[in-house]
């Protein structure tokens, strides 16, 4: 076992006279004065840096002397070299060059005269005048104008704000490559052109069908009998004649399930997508474009920009998916060529969307509005990368009820819901109040006008409408006995009975204002039946299965529907089963009091004898096991209400009398039980629900 101590243990005692000189006593020492052996001790020793400096100086002087005494440089170059020069370096810095301007033994050899190590810096060549774009700050944002271009180029043609920028964040330049830039090139140079020129693709001269190694290509067209492709250049001639419904159905159904599509995101239609669409048109007649995010707020603008910038025709659209037809006479060889944007330019500085005091409000009103908006319920929740086709319509409908509208945008990117707010400001129009807590709060403004406006002229109800309410003998509705009995029990009321209002208001039909009817007409016209679901084959075929005649417009259809509604309303007012209030009587208390008074004196309405037939209710009860004699009996009780077909709902227009006869008859008869017929005879098994308590206790014991 070893013992470890912090201090050494003194085994031997130290000497009394220690010798501080380590030399041995037999060493002979000489005096330095006048002694030859002490010469090396008296000289001053030079440092290593001084020695290296002297070596460099001597070598530099020797090199200069050799250059001066060498008259014929060619002869000197022709002389064979005994040994190549190798720099020995210095002891302190072996990798450093001992002589400036000469190679070190650690330096890499020159690759050759054609590739010098230190390339001279070539000044930037001025850009070509023909390709140099002009950067413009216009009302449409930042644009680039190039000579010979069909239109002004932008980074995004659909999502660029329609507001003039205040200033640029950096010096203006075009992002189309080195030939169009006025600043030093900091990126990677483009690859040199291939020596082998590729054959230009001609859509009118397709390769033979079935050739190996070639992708499938659709023929140009479709063409009508006797018509073929033509080399044309204008947009109208490329499109050709309008497509028929059969042609549209065939083109769209062939692209519904394709995965070769163009995805459009928050930046909308960008400049480089122009070439991408032409690449998709190279092999197919129709390009499928799927839009998600901010660009779906205004799909009309997306379709307009596509047809204007690229050409083609949007033949079908459903929600965020649209199909762009290239044209009957489209040729990929004669397509327009667009320069490629090599990077996204920096966005300029735009005015603030949210003002501290919005236009038309005071500071106190704006503060109260923002405080009220925090407690307001949002009309919808916008998801990330969703389809917002109906957002503008929903906001307009919400403004009919409340002056403030709140939209929940939690989870979205900050720039996305700000772009949505800017679009709503122009499309609705409205005033942006706040973007607080990822919520869009908008105000309808002072100059807002309702779509349900009431005219100034007032008169009796349906004064200007002349409708023949007389029914022919064949079309007269048959009156059932129950209906005739109900009608005789409630005779028609005279005008004096209609005026029995507790508040003293007149309830006669003559006091109805025609403005209410026109307001109802406008409200019916404001409804829209647009669907935003993604197209399917069945839905598309259902939309296209219509007669060849020219379809009726939505205005004509709504006009016919409104006329039918007005006829029914006029008949109801004349028969005393309906009442229309004035605009001044739209207070909640007034409406309630008049409704109560009218319900007590109104005549009954028509009785609908044939209501909806109720389905027979079938109740099945699971089988139970009985442990008597190891026998298992499965019984099921089935209760079928046979009188369900006899039940009828009687609805009286004006008093709402509902009589459910089928349910009462079902309660009187009770439920009927029926056992299933067993293949075997189980005599000791009692039917379910017939055992008494004593018998059940005996069985369980």
From Swiss-Prot:
<dbReference type="InterPro" id="IPR035920">
    <property type="entry name" value="YhbY-like_sf"/>
</dbReference>
<feature type="transit peptide" description="Chloroplast">
    <location>
        <begin position="1"/>
        <end position="37"/>
    </location>
</feature>
<comment type="subunit">
    <text>Interacts with CRS2 and RNA. Part of large ribonucleo-protein complexes that include group IIB introns, CRS2 and CAF1.</text>
</comment>
<dbReference type="GO" id="GO:1990904">
    <property type="term" value="C:ribonucleoprotein complex"/>
</dbReference>
<keyword id="KW-0150">Chloroplast</keyword>
<dbReference type="GO" id="GO:0009570">
    <property type="term" value="C:chloroplast stroma"/>
</dbReference>
<dbReference type="Pfam" id="PF01985">
    <property type="entry name" value="CRS1_YhbY"/>
</dbReference>
<comment type="function">
    <text>Required for the splicing of group IIB introns in chloroplasts. Forms splicing particles with CRS2. Interacts with RNA and confers intron specificity of the splicing particles.</text>
</comment>
<feature type="compositionally biased region" description="Polar residues">
    <location>
        <begin position="479"/>
        <end position="492"/>
    </location>
</feature>
<feature type="region of interest" description="CRS2 binding">
    <location>
        <begin position="564"/>
        <end position="586"/>
    </location>
</feature>
<keyword id="KW-0687">Ribonucleoprotein</keyword>
<dbReference type="GO" id="GO:0006397">
    <property type="term" value="P:mRNA processing"/>
</dbReference>
<dbReference type="InterPro" id="IPR001890">
    <property type="entry name" value="RNA-binding_CRM"/>
</dbReference>
<feature type="compositionally biased region" description="Polar residues">
    <location>
        <begin position="520"/>
        <end position="530"/>
    </location>
</feature>
<keyword id="KW-0677">Repeat</keyword>
<feature type="region of interest" description="Disordered">
    <location>
        <begin position="191"/>
        <end position="221"/>
    </location>
</feature>
<keyword id="KW-0508">mRNA splicing</keyword>
<protein>
    <recommendedName>
        <fullName>CRS2-associated factor 1, chloroplastic</fullName>
    </recommendedName>
</protein>
<keyword id="KW-0809">Transit peptide</keyword>
<keyword id="KW-0694">RNA-binding</keyword>
<feature type="region of interest" description="Disordered">
    <location>
        <begin position="471"/>
        <end position="532"/>
    </location>
</feature>
<dbReference type="GO" id="GO:0003729">
    <property type="term" value="F:mRNA binding"/>
</dbReference>
<feature type="domain" description="CRM 1">
    <location>
        <begin position="241"/>
        <end position="337"/>
    </location>
</feature>
<feature type="domain" description="CRM 2">
    <location>
        <begin position="359"/>
        <end position="455"/>
    </location>
</feature>
<dbReference type="GO" id="GO:0000373">
    <property type="term" value="P:Group II intron splicing"/>
</dbReference>
<keyword id="KW-0507">mRNA processing</keyword>
<dbReference type="InterPro" id="IPR044599">
    <property type="entry name" value="CAF1P_plant"/>
</dbReference>
<keyword id="KW-0934">Plastid</keyword>
<feature type="region of interest" description="Disordered">
    <location>
        <begin position="68"/>
        <end position="136"/>
    </location>
</feature>
């Amino acid at each position: 076992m070893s013992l470890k101590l912090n201090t050494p243990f003194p085994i031997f005692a130290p000497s009394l006279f220690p010798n501080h000189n380590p030399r041995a006593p037999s060493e002979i020492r000489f005096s330095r004065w006048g002694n030859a052996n002490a010469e090396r001790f008296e000289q001053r020793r030079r440092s290593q840096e001084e020695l290296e400096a002297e070596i460099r100086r001597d070598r530099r002087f020797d090199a200069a002397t050799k250059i001066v005494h060498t008259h014929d440089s060619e002869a000197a170059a022709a002389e064979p070299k005994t040994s190549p020069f190798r720099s020995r370096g210095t002891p302190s810095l072996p990798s450093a060059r001992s002589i400036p301007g000469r190679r070190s033994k650690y330096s890499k050899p020159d690759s050759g005269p054609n590739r010098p190590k230190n390339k001279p810096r070539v000044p930037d060549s001025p850009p070509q005048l023909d390709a140099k774009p002009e950067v413009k700050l216009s009302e449409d944002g930042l644009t680039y104008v190039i000579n010979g271009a069909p239109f002004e180029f932008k980074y995004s043609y659909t999502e660029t704000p329609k507001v003039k920028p205040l200033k640029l964040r950096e010096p203006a330049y075009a992002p189309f490559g080195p030939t169009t830039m006025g600043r030093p090139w900091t990126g990677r140079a483009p690859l040199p052109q291939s020596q082998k020129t590729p054959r230009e693709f001609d859509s009118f001269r397709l390769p033979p069908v079935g050739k190996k190694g070639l992708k499938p290509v659709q023929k140009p067209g479709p063409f009508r009998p006797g018509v073929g492709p033509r080399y044309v250049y204008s947009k109208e001639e490329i499109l050709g004649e309008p497509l028929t419904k059969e042609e549209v159905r065939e083109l769209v159904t062939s692209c519904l399930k394709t995965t070769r599509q163009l995805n459009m995101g928050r930046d909308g239609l960008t400049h480089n997508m122009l070439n991408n669409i032409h690449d998709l048109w190279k092999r197919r007649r129709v390009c499928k474009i799927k839009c998600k995010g901010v660009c779906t707020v205004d799909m009309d603008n997306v379709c307009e920009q596509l047809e204007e910038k690229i050409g083609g025709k949007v033949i079908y659209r459903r929600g965020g998916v649209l199909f762009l037809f290239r044209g009957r006479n489209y040729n990929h060889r004669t397509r327009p060529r667009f320069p490629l944007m090599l990077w996204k330019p920096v966005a300029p500085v735009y005015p603030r969307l949210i003002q501290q005091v919005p236009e038309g409000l005071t500071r106190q009103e704006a503060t109260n509005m923002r405080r009220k908006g925090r407690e307001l319920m949002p009309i919808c929740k916008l998801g990330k990368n969703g389809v917002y086709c109906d957002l503008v319509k929903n906001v307009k409908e919400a403004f009919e009820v409340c002056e403030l509208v709140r939209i929940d945008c939690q989870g979205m990117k900050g720039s996305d819901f700000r772009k949505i707010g800017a679009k709503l400001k122009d499309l609705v129009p409205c005033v942006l109040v706040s973007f607080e807590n990822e919520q869009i709060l908008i105000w309808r403004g002072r100059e807002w006008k309702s779509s349900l406006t009431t005219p100034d002229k007032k008169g009796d109800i349906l004064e200007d409408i002349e409708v023949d309410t007389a029914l022919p003998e064949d079309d007269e509705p048959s009156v059932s006995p129950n209906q005739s009995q109900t009608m005789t029990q409630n005779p028609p009321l005279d005008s004096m009975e209609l005026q029995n209002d507790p508040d003293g208001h007149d309830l006669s039909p003559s006091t109805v204002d025609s403005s209410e009817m026109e307001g109802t007409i406008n409200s019916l016209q404001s409804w829209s039946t647009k669907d935003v679901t993604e197209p399917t084959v069945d839905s598309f075929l259902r939309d296209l299965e219509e007669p060849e005649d020219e379809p009726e417009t939505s205005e004509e259809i709504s006009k016919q529907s409104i006329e039918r509604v007005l006829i029914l309303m006029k008949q109801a007012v004349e028969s005393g089963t309906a009442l229309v209030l004035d605009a001044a009587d739209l207070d909640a208390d007034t409406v309630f009091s008049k409704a109560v008074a009218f319900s007590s004196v109104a005549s009954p309405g028509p009785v609908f004898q044939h209501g909806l037939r109720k389905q027979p209710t079938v109740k099945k009860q699971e089988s139970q096991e009985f442990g008597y004699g190891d026998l298992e009996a499965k019984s099921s009780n089935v209760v079928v209400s046979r009188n369900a077909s006899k039940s009828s709902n009687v609805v009286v227009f004006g008093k709402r009398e509902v009589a459910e006869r089928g349910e009462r008859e079902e309660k009187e008869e009770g439920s009927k039980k029926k056992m299933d017929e067993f293949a075997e005879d189980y005599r000791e098994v009692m039917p379910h629900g017939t055992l008494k308590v004593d018998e059940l206790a005996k069985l369980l014991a």
